[in-house]
Design a protein with these regions (language model features):
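Catalytic domains of carbohydrate-active enzymes that cleave complex glycans
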Residues: 1-6, 77, 93-154
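Catalytic-core regions of glycoside hydrolase
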Residues: 1-94
Length: 154
């Protein structure tokens, strides 16, 4: 599996592609050509993208998490690679923006709010969030849309 923006140099080295969602849309022709060779496509988000693109950071509308499922069905991707379920670098109730953990990151490099987690720590186990539930709804919608496409493949 490849989850970076590297494409051409990898050639026939991998069979599952996982571009950042905007990279997939901007280079869809490349990924469709790989799909014709029997390779699979998922999408993911990590730090970016922002703006008009789908992501799951705290500052984005919750409907965007639902749209991951709808977009997956529309663009016929295999799914969404989830990162950051509970990668707390600090107490997420007190600090939603944390320094980037990479030693190569500059002193001013911070992760977007909520990038490290989509659930919260609770005294008796994890606590859900609106972002997590919105993404779940989108995943369920994806399954329903795929069933409808199989029943009516037009």
């Amino acid at each position: 599996m490849e989850a970076t923006n590297t494409r051409e140099a990898l050639g026939n080295s991998i069979d599952i592609w996982c571009p950042i969602i905007n990279d997939f849309q901007e280079n869809e022709q490349f990924f469709r050509s790989r799909e014709k060779l029997g390779e699979q496509i998922l999408v993911y988000t990590c730090l970016v993208p922002g703006g008009k693109w789908l992501n799951r950071t705290l500052d984005m509308e919750k409907i965007r998490q639902v749209y991951f499922g709808w977009g997956g069905s529309k663009y016929n991707t295999l799914g969404y690679l989830h990162w950051g379920l509970n990668q707390y670098k600090a107490n997420p109730f007190n600090q939603s923006v944390v320094k980037h953990p990479s030693p190569a990151a500059s002193a001013n490099n911070y992760l977007p709010a909520g990038d490290t987690h989509i659930i919260y720590p609770g005294a008796n186990g994890p606590l859900s969030s609106l972002r997590f539930e919105s993404h779940r709804i989108g995943s369920e919608d994806f399954e329903i849309l795929e069933i409808l496409k199989r029943k009516n493949p037009k």
